[in-house]
A protein has these predicted regions:
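A charged N-terminal "starter" segment
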Residues: 1-129, 133
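Single conserved hydrophobic/aromatic residue that forms the stacking wall/gate
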Residues: 130-142
Length: 142
């Protein structure tokens, strides 16, 4: 499968005349097409949700585009939580997965209503110590 670049060499040369290097160019049309294709591929599963790893590309414009296609944000830091909130992603549209994390990060995740994903059983006790309780069954499924 051959993929055609979304800009030509000539277009990049023109952009360089205006913007200093280095810079990033994003293919908005391609991002939208891929997000739409992913959403359609899993449309058979009404409970499916894609969570974009904010750490991969912490760009609010990209997060906003992905939000339009139903994507949530996978966050692992206070800054990523703040960025997600700034673009209007809150509640169960945030998956917070983090290790060796300060209490304030977990508190913000809890305040935003994020799903807190733990991969270490000792974190359950830590959350209890900082007064973050396990959700009720109803909260967990809503």
């Amino acid at each position: 499968m051959s993929k055609k670049p979304f800009v030509t060499k000539e277009q990049v040369e023109e952009i360089v005349k205006t913007y200093p290097t280095p810079f990033h160019l994003y293919d908005e049309k391609g991002i939208r097409a891929n997000a739409k294709a992913l959403k359609e591929a899993f449309s058979w599963n009404p409970g499916y949700k894609e969570y974009f790893a904010v750490k991969a590309t912490p760009n609010p414009f990209l997060l906003d585009i992905l939000k339009e296609y139903g994507c949530g944000c996978d966050c692992s830091s206070y800054t990523e939580l703040m960025l997600s909130e700034a673009v209007g992603v809150t509640g169960h549209n945030i998956m917070f997965s983090s290790n060796d994390t300060p209490a304030e990060d977990f508190r913000l995740a809890d305040k935003l209503g994020a799903i807190i994903n733990l991969d270490d059983i000792s974190h359950i006790e830590f959350l209890s110590l900082i007064h973050i309780s396990e959700p009720t069954r109803q909260e967990a499924i809503s």
